[in-house]
Design a protein with these regions (language model features):
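Extracellular/oxidizing-compartment recognition motifs
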Residues: 2-465, 473-474, 490-493, 510-517, ...
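Alpha-helical support elements that line or immediately flank enzyme active sites
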Residues: 148-152, 162, 342-361, 393-396, ...
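Active-site acid/base region of carbohydrate-active enzymes
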Residues: 157, 227, 232, 247-253, ...
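C-terminal catalytic domain of Rieske-type non-heme iron oxygenases
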Residues: 475, 509-516, 693-698, 719-762
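Single conserved hydrophobic/aromatic residue that forms the stacking wall/gate
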Residues: 776-785
């Protein structure tokens, strides 16, 4: 018998996915053995239908590949379940067949949907916080239940209920997409929740990203109220089916959730709870008929990324501390970690007692919560007691916080009054870093916590203030680090679709995706280039050629747009049409602004060249040799234009900042005679600053690589080990538990930075993680893993 087994079978990056719409799903597995040097030499896949009949037998395929294996059987149909197994060979033998795994198809055709969109009556307006609707439908099943599926989605957020029980464990479902194009539906196995006789299906809706506050544009950016679509399909033992969908026969009412806003928080008045509203036997005589919605609905697509989940819980690290504020007692809870999520309240309170919970990342000099950096976001949850023992956990909001201030509790609250619930997209950890320096180890922990908090369905810049947007520049610089820390293949595959959906018809890419501003403006250098950089990074890390192929047309359209708007192949030219972008955002070498001293046309042209180089590699990977040659020629042409404009006859860079040097060196833009001079200038600048960096969002990820790739890893180490600001370790020495937005978010001599832009959970500078982890892996990957 072979001394190895096959385990962790995955389909489309998920274990046993329920409801997918990939017609040729990709399969993956792991070979497990204790023998060093073991290597798969061949594999065989067996796939069967629901009746156990063979759909596909791959036969023995000589290959060491164990990921991205495309199903090659007959065409799949809606709702079909496929069970599959794998056996593998190594040089010494063959494994037994793996344990069976499965995947199930979703609803592949629009005609599969018989349900329609429904909603409650219109309440409030763009400037008004509105209550959350409850929707319910009572129905009777005349036969026993063999199997059942609930296909459900919302414009907004939903929590589905069946017979008094929650359906699934997802949070903030169905997430955030480019609503003009598509919205994702979730599929749940609900057979165990149904019974013969009366049943009740229900849903609670929240505003979410669809009609709540999003970014800094206020409410109702996409729609005026949340909407629900749900289709319950029941299979009976005799093979017959019962289908129930949302329509005008559903009932709607407003209950205890008076406010459900991602940025502002929740207000739950437990006195308004309607016990049993989602279960049989409830009297819904006072409820109104739900409204059907006939508007231009987005396409319904199966969930293709990881679900948002409640991942872990944290208890306060100390007893709550009293804070006297104008004679009013407030209590401060410290969870010891800047996190993203909510707090669960568990208490016995008299009826009518109202607790106000305010969330913050930091404390001010007086020991009170610091909220100035939240701007207009309130991050406040309010709970009014119904009397007795009760538990409350917000459903449709999330906060960025370490501290929670509680107001209204009668007396001194116990430490276990609150429990922090950490929420983020469910991404398995895949990498770790540890060394002999505890500060660097804490830096790595801060990077990981920053990734957790900002990977909530969309890679956001920050999780606390009135922004929380999918900034493309932040995402592309951090993507290599993210892929080391966690399995982000499905996460970025989903977001890449958001980015493509936000693309303007002329090819330009906006600075954020989903695009809440609807102008689809040019995101500018290093931001809009995410359309090319992120899928290439995913290909390097996961070998995901389908992602490249699926978005190749979008990438080509983007490159064509750049060709049209870059006179003389100089992108972001001062005399050009498109905006010049954000420069080296928050660099310290500027004259007091936010964009740094590096010329924006230098950054733009450097990224134009890098985009052409990557497009050549992408085309080559896809077998498009003609395009590969064309983009290689384009890279050389842009390189010549870069040299002509930015490299002097003496071999120096015009605008010779740390970022300019790092980009020119890493992107291969310099003539051979200029490389040593530019690198020497970079080293001198770092030394002149006392082994400190001056880079912003654009230059920082490339700086340590530029140094180590040119034989001076010692300088990169000196930057890494620097404890005075600006440095990675400065925030660590100040007690940070996540990555700060600014190098000087807080200093002893100046206190807090400008509150309008001072997040304490901003992963961009955490891009150093890719360099840290490359030390273990020796080098950046030159081919897909």
């Amino acid at each position: 018998m072979a001394s190895f087994t096959v385990a962790q079978l995955r389909c489309e990056y998920r274990e046993n996915p329920l409801g997918i719409d990939e017609l040729r799903p990709r399969l993956a597995w792991q070979m497990r053995t204790r023998r060093r040097g073991a290597r798969q030499s061949a594999f065989q896949i067996l796939a069967r239908d629901e009746a156990g009949q063979t759909l596909w037998d791959s036969g023995k395929i000589e290959s060491d590949q164990s990921t991205q294996i495309e199903y090659a059987g007959p065409e799949l149909r809606s709702r079909q379940r496929v069970t599959w197994q794998v056996r593998v060979w190594d040089e010494g033998g063959v494994s037994v067949l793996s344990r069976p795994a499965w995947w199930e198809m979703g609803l592949l055709e629009p005609a599969d949907w018989t349900a329609g969109w429904i909603q409650g009556g219109l309440v409030g307006g763009p400037r008004t916080i509105v209550p959350a609707p409850l929707l319910r439908k009572s129905f009777t099943l005349a036969k026993p239940v063999a199997a059942a599926r609930l296909y459900v989605s919302a414009l907004g957020l939903f929590e589905a209920r069946l017979n008094g029980q929650p359906v699934g464990e997802d949070a903030l479902a169905p997430g955030w997409t480019e609503y003009a194009k598509r919205v994702r539906y979730h599929v749940h196995d609900v057979g165990s929740l149904l019974v013969p006789g009366e049943n009740v299906i229900g849903a609670l809706l929240g505003d979410g990203w669809y009609c709540g506050h999003v970014g800094f544009q206020g409410r109702q950016r996409y729609g005026e109220r949340p909407r629900l679509i749900a289709q319950l399909e029941v299979v009976h033992p005799d093979g017959s089916r019962t289908t129930l969908g949302t329509d005008g026969s559903w009932a709607v009412a407003y209950g205890p959730l008076l406010q459900a806003d991602l940025l502002m928080g929740e207000h739950w008045d437990a006195r308004l709870e309607m016990s049993g509203w989602d279960a049989p036997g409830f009297d819904a005589a006072g409820w109104q008929a739900a409204e059907t919605w006939q508007g231009a609905a987005p396409s319904l697509v199966a969930r293709n990324g990881p679900a948002i989940r409640r991942i872990q819980e944290l208890a306060p690290v100390a007893d709550p501390q009293p804070i006297e504020d104008f004679g009013v007692a407030r209590w401060l809870f410290d969870f010891g970690q800047n996190l993203v999520g909510v707090v669960r309240l568990q208490a016995t309170l008299a009826s009518g007692v109202t607790l106000t919970l305010r969330h913050a990342e930091a404390l001010d000099a007086d020991g009170r919560i610091y909220t100035a950096n939240l701007r207009s976001a309130q991050q406040t949850d309010i709970y009014t007691s119904r009397g007795g023992a009760q538990v409350y956990e917000p459903r449709f909001t999330f906060h960025g916080f370490r501290y929670v201030e509680v107001h209204g509790y009668p007396g001194a609250p116990p430490r276990d009054l609150l429990t922090a619930v950490v929420i983020h997209s469910d991404m398995p950890p895949t990498g770790a870093f540890s060394c002999s320096n505890p500060l660097i180890n804490q830096l790595q922990r801060n990077i990981v916590w920053g990734q957790k908090g900002n990977f909530v369905d969309v890679p956001t810049d920050c999780p606390q203030r009135d922004e929380r947007l999918g900034w493309t520049g932040d995402a592309q610089v951090f993507a290599p680090t993210a892929a080391f820390n966690m399995d982000v293949a499905a996460f970025f595959s989903k977001w890449q679709q958001d980015l493509a959906d936000a693309q303007h018809e002329n090819g330009r890419i906006p600075p954020i995706a989903p695009d809440t501003r609807f102008g689809h403006e040019d995101g500018g250098p290093a931001w809009a280039d995410a359309i090319v950089i992120v899928p290439w990074t995913m290909y390097q890390r996961y070998g995901d050629a389908r992602l490249l192929a699926r978005h190749y047309a979008s990438m080509k359209a983007w490159m064509a747009y750049l060709a049209e708007t870059s006179p003389g192949r100089i992108r972001a030219h001062p005399d050009g049409v498109p905006r010049q972008g954000y420069g080296d955002w928050l660099a310290l070498d500027g004259s007091g602004g936010t964009q740094g001293a590096t010329p924006r046309d230098l950054i733009g042209t450097a990224y134009y060249a890098q985009g052409a180089r990557l497009m050549g590699q992408i085309a080559q990977a896809l077998g498009k040799t003609g395009d590969a040659k064309r983009y290689a020629r384009l890279f050389e042409a842009i390189r010549r234009a870069f040299i002509h404009r930015f490299v002097t006859d003496d071999g120096l860079l015009i605008g010779q900042t740390q970022t300019a040097c790092a980009l020119a060196l890493r992107f291969g833009l310099l003539p051979a005679k200029a490389r040593s001079g530019v690198f020497s200038a970079l080293a001198r600048d770092i030394a002149a600053r006392g082994n400190r960096l001056s880079t912003g969002f654009v230059g920082t990820p490339h700086l340590p690589f530029a140094l180590s790739e040119n034989g001076r890893a010692d300088i990169a180490y000196a930057l890494l080990n620097q404890r005075d600001w600006p440095s990675w370790l400065y925030s660590v020495t100040q007690g940070a538990t996540t990555i700060w937005e600014r190098w000087d978010g807080w200093t002893k001599d100046k206190g807090f930075q400008t509150p309008s832009m001072n997040s304490f959970n901003h992963y961009a500078y955490g891009a150093i993680g890719a360099w840290l982890l490359s030390l273990i892996h020796i080098s950046e990957p030159t081919r897909p893993y």
